[in-house]
């Protein structure tokens, strides 16, 4: 929604709390650039209203207020890997993103050689139970750089995911979002978890082409975004809906 018009009342000074509350609902338009732009044609993510980012330690020290004005209306922040690794920038990013008025959530990179319940406990230990946060995310993909070379069967994958997601949903009271990439989805997730929201990576084609028949909540459309407020490249994402639908979804999930 548009920012409140204050020019007509130059003598009035809003209290910081009121100004912050008003500003938090504002949607900033997309001003990101892309080092490797893709022409999505009529299915361009730019036609959608609510854009955001996902970040980790690789983005370094982020100027969150500046990033927000570039169009980061939401951010998913890397929190944990496996059962014993915490992203060193998580706590700082978690705090400063909220201070900047950005709707933010945390994500966990799942390790296939670790027990699912241990990973859930590690995430819960490190990610605050903030009622304003977006639903937590489980990031499931194949990692060629991992020391864990054994790939579980599709059934084992889904069983591990279910244990992890059930534990998080009980703790945070919000159904987790599943983030995935095309190869992992094809191997393990086609037709599964139809009652969970999906966040889909599709950087060359629209998700409807890469994941036919799969409804999606978020689309990661670029891994080469450029923005003021961040020195390195950044992942760009968009919410599947209008600005009004975004606010309704936030109300529904309690964020």
At which residue positions do the language-model features occur?
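Functionally critical loop-and-helix segments that line ligand-binding/catalytic clefts
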Residues: 2-52, 193-255
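Substrate-binding cleft of extracellular glycoside hydrolase catalytic domains
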Residues: 37, 45-65, 78-162, 169-171
